[in-house]
């Protein structure tokens, strides 16, 4: 799922064979109102995207809603909110917000996630978070 119609179209082209075989589907949607029923996914991933999610906690509640019990949510960011150089991106890109690990963990806990594990590359300011429903 992607918010961008352009990204969805490109992903559909790139994954045409897998889509035809029924191995995946690519849909346009908004993470604050995920267009899928409750408890349908084992895994949800967010690569370089939570920066742009409107109302982070609400979006995390939505991810939690569509995950099965015991499901996994993976967040990967190349910015961990501790690098002053990242300020250039938030000035250039309207609506972009870079979160620290602590901010993401707090929002995940509020949304009902447990067993939250954080992995970081402090040299490059990268973070990955794995949370279980």
List each model region and its residues.
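A short SAM/SAH-binding and catalytic strip from SAM-dependent methyltransferases
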Residues: 43-56
């Amino acid at each position: 799922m992607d918010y961008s119609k352009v990204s969805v179209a490109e992903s559909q082209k790139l994954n045409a064979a897998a889509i035809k075989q029924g191995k995946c589907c690519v849909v346009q949607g908004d993470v604050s109102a995920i267009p899928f029923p409750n408890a349908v996914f084992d895994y949800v991933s967010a690569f370089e995207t939570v920066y742009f999610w409107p109302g982070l906690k609400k979006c995390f509640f939505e991810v939690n809603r569509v995950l099965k019990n015991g499901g996994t949510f993976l967040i990967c960011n190349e910015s961990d909110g501790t690098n002053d150089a990242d300020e250039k991106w938030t000035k250039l890109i309207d609506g972009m917000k870079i979160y620290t690990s602590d901010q993401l963990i707090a929002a995940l806990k509020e949304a009902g996630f447990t067993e939250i594990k954080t992995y970081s590359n402090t040299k490059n300011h990268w973070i990955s978070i794995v949370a279980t429903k």
